[in-house]
Amino acid sequence: KSALKIDPNQQRVEFSDGSLKYDHLVLSTGSKPRELPPYNSRKIKNLFTMRDLNDANSIEAFMKSGMRLLIVGGGYIGLEAAATARKFGVDVTLVEIEERILKRVAAKETSDYIRSLHISNGVKIKEAIGLDKLEIVGEKVVNASLTDGSDINVDFVIVGIGITPNTDLAEGANLKINNGILINEKCQTSVSNIYAAGDCTSFKYKNTLVRLESVGNAIDQATTVAQNIMKQNTSYTPKPWFWSDQYDLKLQIAGLNTGYDEVVVRKGESRQVSHWYYKGQSLLAVDALNDPRCYMIGKRLIEANKSPSKNQLRDENFNLKVLLK
């Protein structure tokens, strides 16, 4: 059943069929995918968003070899969907309104690598071009008009334009909200016996307010919440890490690149490469592409607040492991 309202003063959650008292309350309300206004994917049979296993199963059951797919959004969700669709023999066009794919989350070097990978696998990528409108016949999309004036005949559309944290319950309880439910280092909201964890939360990381959309963050915050409810007085220390699998590429990311002013490229063997984000002389994050060794070293350096010199990174013969001692 669904919770309808939280009463922090009475420490009570209301449901359609009654209510429940609490001593401690945990909000792990997650997030929902952004829709394409004015289109509602629940009413259009071949318009999909991607958020959970049910979405993935619905898309997989629908697509067949030779179908024409339009993906709206060049973030990780859209790109992973493109890679999967190509494995099924689907004809894929991806549009991204920004000047390059992954602009919000990655450096140009990472965007360039992944763009080339997709093009080599037959994906048509259109950057700085957005969706103008969809032509709906009955309950299906049949055509898409793009902002460059072109039209694409489509068999189905996947929308990957980000997510919105589910904060309605928290807002109704007058908890503090800022791009998510605000929490402190104990994962407490603005009401001390109400906690929150996962995609729905925002918090301070290196003096910047962030919201992390990752499995690791959700697990770590949930652990912190449980420990504090059990009076273990635990503080949550964010250790951001992410990954993305596309074709034979494994991209692993450690840290957050917010505010970077330089990217150092370290080449490895064959198709291995890593991109290291710096602000001044401080290491912020690393994107490791098919390079798990650099990912693990970078992750440990960031967590230890250590920064190799940029020349050390550029030197392919320099053993980064010595920096971990």
Predicted regions and their residues:
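Short hydrophobic core segments
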Residues: 20-32, 72, 152-162, 222, ...
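Glycine-rich dinucleotide-binding loop and its adjacent helix/turn
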Residues: 29-88
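FAD-site-proximal beta/loop scaffold in flavoenzymes
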Residues: 43-65, 138-145, 150-224
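Cysteine/selenocysteine-centered motifs that mediate thiol-based redox chemistry or coordinate metal-sulfur cofactors
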Residues: 59, 307-325
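Rossmann-like dinucleotide-binding cores of NAD(P)H-dependent redox enzymes
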Residues: 76-133, 214-215, 238-243
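Mid-to-C-terminal Rossmann-like scaffold of FAD/NAD(P)H-dependent oxidoreductases
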Residues: 200-296
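A short, polar/charged loop-to-alpha-helix boundary motif
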Residues: 292-311
